[in-house]
C-alpha cells in the first residue's frame, strides 16, 4: 500500500518579485500567471502547509529607480510599498476565487483595505489555516522586499524561506549571459555574501544567516516547482548558515 508523500516543511514563506507576476508582459499583472501561482499555493494549503507570502512591487513601481532620477528616496519607497499592496490584493483575490482562506496584512495602515501587520495575529492566522500575505515591505523606507521577507520569515517562525526567481537556482555567474556558469546545489550565506552572488541584498542575507533561516532559491516560471521544493525534491539551490 503506497503512502502519500508528505511535505518536508510545515510552515513556509514564499517570496516573489513583482516581475514574477508579469509573465511575458512589460508591465503590470498577467492574470494567467497570478492564477497559476494561486493554484500551486492552494495545493500546498491542501497538503497542510502553512503559507506566508511576500510579493515585491517592481512590476508596477520601483522607488529606487525614481530616486536616482531625482525623486526623494523616502517618497519613492513609500510608493513602492503601495505597489506591493496592489500585488498582494491581486493574489488575495486569486486565492479567494479558488476557495483558499487568506488574509492580507500590511506594514502600513490601510484599515479600509486590510488589517495591520501584528506578528502574533499573523501567526494565529497561519495556525487557523489561512494563507497570510504580508504587504508594504517592512513599512520603512530604504529596506527591500527581500529584507521584508527575511524579517517576516524570522518573525513568523517559518521552517524555510522560498525565493521565486527566473532561474533554477544560484550560479557562479549569470547563466543567461555566461555558458560556463556553474549551479550551486547548496552554499552558505557567508559565501553568498563574500562572493556577491546576488542572492539577496546584504541585509537580508545577514538576517537569515544570523537566525539560521534556510533559503531555497528556485525557478517560479516552471509549473509545480514550488510544490516539488516544499515536498523536499532536489530543486533549486539551498542556502544555509
Swiss-Prot record:
Keyword hit for DNA-binding: no
SUPFAM superfamilies reported for this sequence: Carbamate kinase-like
One Pfam entry name: AA_kinase
EC number: 2.7.4.22
Record key words, sorted: ATP-binding, Cytoplasm, Kinase, Nucleotide-binding, Pyrimidine biosynthesis, Transferase
Membership in a protein family: Belongs to the UMP kinase family.
Role played: Catalyzes the reversible phosphorylation of UMP to UDP.
Oligomeric and partner information: Homohexamer.
Protein name stated in the entry: Uridylate kinase
Source organism of this protein record: Dichelobacter nodosus (strain VCS1703A)
Amino acid at each position: 500500500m503506497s503512502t502519500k508523500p508528505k511535505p518536508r516543511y510545515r510552515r513556509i514563506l514564499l517570496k516573489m518579485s513583482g516581475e514574477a507576476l508579469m509573465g511575458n508582459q512589460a508591465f503590470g499583472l498577467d492574470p494567467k500567471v497570478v492564477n497559476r501561482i494561486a493554484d500551486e499555493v492552494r495545493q500546498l494549503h491542501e497538503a497542510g502547509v502553512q503559507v506566508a507570502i511576500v510579493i515585491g512591487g517592481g512590476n508596477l513601481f520601483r522607488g529606487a529607480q525614481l530616486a536616482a532620477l531625482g525623486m526623494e528616496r523616502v517618497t519613492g519607497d513609500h510608493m513602492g510599498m503601495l505597489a506591493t499592496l496592489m500585488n498582494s490584493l491581486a493574489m488575495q483575490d486569486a486565492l479567494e476565487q479558488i476557495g483558499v482562506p487568506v488574509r492580507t496584512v500590511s506594514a502600513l495602515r490601510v484599515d479600509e483595505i486590510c488589517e495591520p501587520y501584528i506578528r502574533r495575529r499573523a501567526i494565529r492566522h497561519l495556525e487557523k489555516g489561512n494563507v497570510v500575505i504580508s504587504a508594504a515591505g517592512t513599512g520603512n523606507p530604504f529596506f527591500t522586499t527581500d529584507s521584508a521577507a527575511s524579517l517576516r520569515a524570522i518573525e513568523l517562525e517559518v521552517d524555510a524561506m522560498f525565493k521565486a526567481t527566473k532561474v533554477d537556482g544560484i550560479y557562479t555567474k549569470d547563466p543567461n549571459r555566461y555558458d560556463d556558469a556553474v549551479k550551486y546545489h547548496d552554499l552558505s550565506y557567508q559565501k553568498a555574501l563574500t562572493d556577491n552572488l546576488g542572492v539577496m541584498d546584504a541585509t537580508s542575507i545577514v538576517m537569515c544567516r544570523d537566525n539560521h533561516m534556510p533559503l531555497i532559491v528556485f525557478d517560479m516560471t516552471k509549473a509545480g516547482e514550488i510544490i516539488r521544493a516544499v515536498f523536499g525534491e532536489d530543486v533549486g539551490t539551498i542556502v544555509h548558515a
